[in-house]
Amino acid sequence: MFLAQEIIRKKRDGHALSDEEIRFFINGIRDNTISEGQIAALAMTIFFHDMSIPERVSLTMAMRDSGSVLDWKSLNLNGPIVDKHSTGGVGDVTSLMLGPMVAACGGYIPMISGRGLGHTGGTLDKLEAIPGFDIFPNDTRFREIIKDVGVAIIGQTSSLAPADKRFYATRDITATVDSIPLITASILAKKLAEGLDALVMDVKVGSGAFMPTFELSAALAEAIVGVSNGAGVRTTALLTDMNQVLASSAGNAVEVREAVQFLTGEYRNPRLFDVTMALCVEMLISGKLAKDDAEARAKLQAVLDNGKAAEIFGRMVAAQKGPNDFVENYAKYLPTAMLSKAVYADTEGFVSAMDTRALGMAVVSMGGGRRQASDTIDYSVGFTDMARLGDSVDGQRPLAVIHAKDENSWQEAAKAVKAAIQLDDKAPETTPTVYRRITD
């Protein structure tokens, strides 16, 4: 038996906590025997004193074990359970293609996703732009979809890592969100509850990233890889670029439209293709579905070319109560905005920099995201045909096409787009889409 205040005191004085002490505290968070003040105190001591790798592993596993952990053995699946997690960005629609692509190559992807947070779009919000799409199937149905289709994308239920929800709510109001050990545990507790064999992390870098600097993004990636491997799940991470909108669109329905076009081959944004393929390659290699990069890329290209990935996306949508013919008739089903027109730069030039965070917030301001949990989303609004870094813009080539609910909203968004995109008289140097691969 431990005392919460003694655990806090021990960490306050700079000592490492034992696995038993950490589990006692996390179970107390779950059971409401630890007060909010005590949670806040421990969070602040961790913020200032950090945690060793063994402590981080213990914290992550204790938070994972505070709820149910999915077990797939009874399904006798003939492939690995794999997933991807992104730290979030703007126009980051990779999950919608990646899940079906990896499933088409023999993986099983039980993806538990989130809603939009701040300037970043949420995979669940995007999928809810599809009429009828059910993000909360019951456990039996979820397992059926994984076995039959190979991929399902659902929301977090109250039974998964419940201690994390209360811990995060306290961190949010005590300025302790941006602590690497606490971020690591929060992300991995939910992901490891999926019962994974392998995980790939997509950690964003740049003006639209969660972490403000390259160094902090790299530190977070290294922490997650170290802890997840320490917890027994094969994990790698990619540092990917978020200095511009990743896809050609940003919003909900507009990104779903682009995802379908990507899968069918109608249109593939080159940067989105690079990042999606790189993440899928990691999943295939970590899941032992391919021996190397070349074999993985060949398999992935094949399932795009032969339509198998698009078919699996369509089957997932239908299995989660969306339309049976969504892939074939997406334009009929996705909501469209009342007003769609282009915004042009005031001068000619090359796009030299982009405040990606500001562009994400512009989508939120149009109604495409939430400022608070009770807000409703306008799934139709957003940007398409986004200019990319290095593009020459003028009276013919717009900065973006804005999809808005009315003229006032369009004008506000146009102002935000112009302010967020810098022009220069010469093109900037090209930056990579993937900066670094991190392994244990």
UniProtKB/Swiss-Prot annotation:
Instruction: Give GO BP annotations, semicolon-separated.
Output: pyrimidine nucleobase metabolic process; thymidine metabolic process
The protein's Enzyme Commission number: 2.4.2.4
Alphabetically ordered keywords of this record: Glycosyltransferase, Transferase
Query: What domain of life?
Result: Bacteria
EC class, as a word, reads: transferase
Q: Which Gene Ontology cellular component terms are annotated? A: cytosol
Q: In which pathway does it act?
A: Pyrimidine metabolism; dTMP biosynthesis via salvage pathway; dTMP from thymine: step 1/2
Recorded GO molecular functions are: 1,4-alpha-oligoglucan phosphorylase activity; thymidine phosphorylase activity
Do you know which PROSITE patterns this protein is assigned to?
THYMID_PHOSPHORYLASE
Transmembrane stretches, start-end = none
Complex formation: Homodimer.
| Function per UniProt | The enzymes which catalyze the reversible phosphorolysis of pyrimidine nucleosides are involved in the degradation of these compounds and in their utilization as carbon and energy sources, or in the rescue of pyrimidine bases for nucleotide synthesis.
As for family, the record states: Belongs to the thymidine/pyrimidine-nucleoside phosphorylase family.
The protein's name = Thymidine phosphorylase
| Source species | Enterobacter sp. (strain 638)
Q: Which gene encodes it?
A: deoA
